[in-house]
Amino acid sequence: MAEPNPRRSARPRIVVVFYSATGNVAALAEALGEGARGEGAEVRVRPVVERAPAEAIEGNRRWKEWVENNPYETTASLDDLEWADGIALGSPTRFGGAAEQLKAFLDTTGGLWAQGKLASKVGTSFTSASTEHGGLETTIAAMNNVYYHWGTLIMPLGYAADPSLMSSGNPYGASWVSKKSSAPDDDALVAARVQGARLAQVAAKIAD
């Protein structure tokens, strides 16, 4: 007879790990976390450490404002990944891939990977770009490549999760095109909430 799973019926654990330069990806991360909480999940929303040189940040007003005023006191850690049943990764596009800041954090996960501690969790990804064809899908796919190596089960946003996604969503994951430095609109935030809710639902089943 199988041993009972001590986590059975417990709330699913979701961690949202992201990099944001101006706050747009952070807004999507918070909406995703909100959607997961709506499904009863325990949620941690964690930015990764900023690694860009000061002179680069100084040259961009919105980047500088975010670095100086962002509200996060706790940054992402390996413990957050091990704790979670479901993981969401978020980053602005950088030439069709994730930002170096997020990649640097992910490059520290080798120990957890070697121990199999990231396998059989559920993963999903989201992004933002400044242009309509600036690499939204390729950035999400690039982040998902990490899940393949971890053995994490990949959960796309899809279109079936909510009717509104047929007109406003990206089936790869929540995304936002920030024209003229605009913040995510209601459609983008709804897509992120739907993604978070779906991640919590699937993670709960996997944790059981």
Where is each model-derived feature located?
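N-terminal beta1-alpha1-beta2 submodule of the flavodoxin-like/Rossmannoid cofactor-binding fold
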Residues: 1-117, 176-208
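Short glycine/serine/threonine-biased micro-segments
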Residues: 21, 84, 88, 94, ...
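Short, glycine-/small-residue-rich phosphate/pyrophosphate-handling segment
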Residues: 119-167
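A charged, well-structured terminal subsegment
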Residues: 148-173, 178, 182-190, 199
